[in-house]
């Protein structure tokens, strides 16, 4: 939770800065350089958007699965269901968090 709550606002700010850079590229740079900045900026914006969506979706699904697991009484059944139901969302969530950290250059 902590990583998500810290990372998403940073992603939003970074995405806004990229949008500003892309919008200003053609007024500041030569056409060829502006196009390159525009293309790189748009790709980064799309990548950020995809990873933020992946984080939100998988965090929600993981919470839902975790609620179902916590209702079980039997510890073995809990462990099996956690492994089968919660962990896959956790792994995908970790992937999106790591990718977003890489894009944002955040440790």
Where are these regions (language model features)?
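C-terminal amphipathic alpha-helical interaction region
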Residues: 1-107
